[in-house]
Each structure stands twice: as C-alpha cells, then as structure tokens.
C-alpha cells in the first residue's frame, strides 16, 4: 500500500475522523465500507498514538469539540444531499438558495471549532480562513 505521510493539524485529523464516522453510519455499500473502515482505523490509531504520547489537559474539552464537529458535519451531509436533490429536479429556487447559504454558515462554525481544537492542542499547523464578511 502506498501512502503519503504529511503533518496535519489536530483539528483536521478530528474533522476527517468525524466525517469517516458519519460515512460509516450512513453508507451501506460493503465495498465502500471496507475503505471507510480501513481509513477510519488508520486515523484513529494515529490519534490514539498522539493523545497517548502527550498529556492533553483538555481531554474532555477535546471530546466535546469533536462531538460538535461531528454534529456540524452530519448537518452538512444532509444539506449537501438536499442540494443534490434540488439539482436533480432543476429546483434552484428559495430552498436551494437557503441550503447553499447554510453550507457557508455551517462551514464557518466548523472552521471555528477546528481552530479551537488546534489552539487547545497547541497544534503547530493552523487552518487560516478569510472570507468576505456577511
């Protein structure tokens, strides 16, 4: 198996884990689930190594932030599915606009949580975002 080893922030790692957990819960295709489970196990092993090697003072806080991240990613999953239904039906009216706007709001929340995770874990890699204010 070929892999690329690259450093990522704690926020990004937890984000990836949360998305894979959501996929594991919602995808029924056994072939896809095999890949999802493999990826999830690899990432969880790495996270376990890191948290075990470092004494995180904010372990409970980290768990709460992870759950918040997973909740937001689950909402994004539904919103994106609903947008695809609108696309399929060529429905680009109010519902589509509302869903599209929700993606921005949810991604802004997601970004804040990832930054909070990075600050809590003293991650040397930080995800920086800048968008036009609304």
Predicted regions and their residues:
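Extended, charge-rich alpha-helical interface modules
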Residues: 1-134
